[in-house]
Structure formats: structure tokens, C-alpha cells
Design a protein with these regions (language model features):
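Active-site proximal loop and beta-alpha junction motif in alpha/beta enzyme cores
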Residues: 1-90, 97-335
Length: 335
């Protein structure tokens, strides 16, 4: 066996999206902030992103959380997120899963029925409250960073749809185009996954070609994520599907997307401080979102969101990187 690097991961799923948490094998990443660490990784170790996320070790839908040492006082660890096409600032599923892994494997000591874990991210420190039943973590609540509407009441011309109203919202650093499913001509149902992917990719192409999107802290930016959703019913349940990466559809309800949608509903007057939203994914599993407060981001009205979900550990892996392997850095065939 030959390998000049061994990377250990703990695998888990959060509401259906299978993920990995890198726990060792990278060494200490230089940088005073999570952004510094992610940029150093991107500049010097991006081949490990492709090597881990793409085949033969990964697949086109794989999202990976990378654990680092903390960068702020009181934090337990840091996280940034990699996927086949690049990097994410934040990820609810990944943060819920990483907190669950840290507690269930003993990396962070439990404090009783409820344990407070602080996670450093590029969007800022995230306070999590993990609730335990016996040996397992049954739910994790993220007390997250501000979310807001960047552009409201936009209209783009979408192939196969025509004129389509939409909004651009920011959920804890991730930027989303938010589209009403009925107006997009598709239902948010598991059996329509392929059509959701096609429609989402068409919306993303139209948004990036026709809109100028500027976000505080990011400047002019591309929109990589499309949320296709239905308005909450009488019980506050709102189905949604995230289209991301190379045309993938998230099985889970999307944590940062839930925050973006709550910011939009708050902007529309559909949610107030203290209101909750049940964000339902394509598998029928839920995140519960709550608006904990209001704030401002560079003069824009914003919300302080909370999201609660559950993760389950699924395995432990060690990945080898043979210097002689011609596919060491990964590959992805066009589907």
C-alpha cells in the first residue's frame, strides 16, 4: 500500500443528505480566520477537494465539512464546506452533523441533556444547542448569523417558463434565488426531482445572465443556489427543494436556505419575531426554523434565525492518496 496522505472522515446524514466530516489528515491550516483557512486550503490543497468530492472517492452530489481548530475565544472547532464545484460559506446540514459527530464520538464533552457547542464558520461563530437522549444526540438547534433579502420582486426570462418572478435572499452567507414552485411550473415532490433539477438550472442561468447581484461582504456575486418552494400551509409547513452544484437536488430541507426563506417571509410580512417555519425536504423530513430576532446588515433589515434538525452517523472512512494513481485528484463524467 502506498499513500502520501491519509484523510479520516466520519460519515453522517442530516435529514437525508449524506455528508462527510474531515476529522484528520490535513494538518493545521494556516490563517487567523475561517476565511483565511479556507482560502489557504483553496490555494494549496484544492486537489484534495476534488480528490475527496469527485469519483472514485466521492460523487457529484457529495458535500463535505472540513473541521479545523477554532479561531475565536470559546469556540470548540471550525468548519468550512467543500463540494464538487467549489466551496460553501455555511451549511446547516453540515453544522448539525458535525456537532452531532463531535458529541457522539467524544471530541466535545457533553454537559448533560443539553450541550452548548460553538462552531466557527466563515459567516461567523454559530452557537449550537444539542439535546441528548441516552447515548445519542436527538436534535441540534443552530443559533445562526443574520439573514436578509438582497433583491426583492425581480423578474427574469427563463427558458421553458417565460417571465418568472423571484427574489434573491441571503441565508447565513449563502446566496439563493427563491422561486415559487407553482409559478415555475413544477411541484416540490420526490417524483419530480429531475424536472426540479432542470428548472432550477434554467433559473440559475437566467439569474446570472440577467441580474446584477451585490451582497454585503461579498460584493458582486454569482447566484449558485436555487430554492424552489411552496408557501407555508395552515400548519406552517413549507415544502422546498434546493438545486445546487452541477444540477443536484438536495434531499434535505437546506438549513441556510430555510434561513433565507424566513428572511423573505419576514420581508413579506408572513413571519414575525417568534414565528416558526417547518421546512420540509423531498423525503418528508423537516427542519424547524424560528425567527429569534431582528437586526440590520449594512442598513438592510435582517433576521436572526434558528434552525433545528437531526443527524445520524453512518460510518467511518480512511481515504488514501497514492502518488502513482492517475485518478488521484478525482474525476466526474458528464451525465
Amino acid at each position: 500500500m502506498r499513500s502520501d496522505r491519509v484523510i479520516a472522515t466520519t460519515d453522517f446524514h442530516t435529514a437525508g443528505i449524506g455528508m462527510r466530516l474531515v476529522t484528520s489528515g490535513l494538518g493545521r491550516l494556516p490563517g487567523a480566520t475561517l476565511g483565511d483557512k479556507r482560502r489557504w486550503f483553496q490555494e494549496h490543497l484544492d486537489h484534495l477537494r476534488t480528490g475527496l468530492c469527485l469519483e472514485p472517492r466521492g460523487h457529484r452530489s457529495l458535500l463535505i465539512a472540513v473541521m479545523t481548530e477554532p479561531v475565536t475565544p470559546g469556540a470548540h472547532f471550525g468548519l468550512f464546506f467543500i463540494y464538487p464545484s467549489g466551496y460553501y460559506v455555511s451549511c446547516g446540514e453540515g453544522t448539525i452533523g458535525a456537532t452531532t459527530v463531535a458529541l457522539e464520538t467524544g471530541m466535545v464533552a457533553r454537559q448533560g441533556v443539553e450541550t452548548r457547542v460553538v462552531v466557527d464558520t466563515e459567516a461567523g461563530p454559530v452557537e449550537t444547542i444539542a439535546r441528548s437522549e441516552g447515548d445519542r444526540v436527538c436534535a441540534v438547534t443552530l443559533r445562526w448569523t443574520p439573514s436578509f433579502v438582497a433583491l426583492a420582486d425581480q423578474v427574469v426570462e427563463v427558458d421553458g417558463v417565460g417571465e418568472l418572478p423571484l427574489d434573491i435572499a441571503v441565508g447565513v452567507g449563502n446566496v439563493f434565488a427563491v422561486v415559487d414552485a407553482a409559478r415555475a411550473g413544477v411541484a416540490v415532490r420526490r417524483e419530480h426531482t429531475r424536472k426540479l433539477a432542470q428548472r432550477g438550472m434554467a433559473v440559475r442561468e437566467a439569474v446570472n445572465a440577467q441580474l446584477h447581484v451585490e451582497v454585503p461582504g461579498l460584493g458582486k456575486t454569482q447566484v449558485d443556489n436555487v430554492l424552489i418552494h411552496e408557501l407555508p400551509d395552515a400548519h406552517g409547513v413549507s415544502p422546498n427543494a434546493l438545486v445546487w452544484g452541477p444540477g443536484q437536488v438536495d434531499a434535505a430541507p437546506c438549513g441556510s436556505g430555510t434561513c433565507a426563506r424566513m428572511a423573505l417571509f419576514h420581508h413579506r410580512g408572513l413571519m414575525a419575531v417568534g414565528s416558526t417555519l417547518v421546512s420540509r425536504g423531498l423525503l418528508g423530513l423537516d427542519f424547524t426554523g424560528r425567527i429569534a430576532g431582528e437586526t440590520r446588515v449594512e442598513g438592510r433589515p435582517a433576521i436572526l434565525p434558528e434552525v433545528t434538525g437531526t443527524a445520524y452517523l453512518t460510518g467511518f472512512s480512511q481515504f488514501l492518496f497514492d502518488p502513482a494513481d492517475p485518478l488521484r485528484d478525482g474525476f466526474l463524467l458528464d451525465a
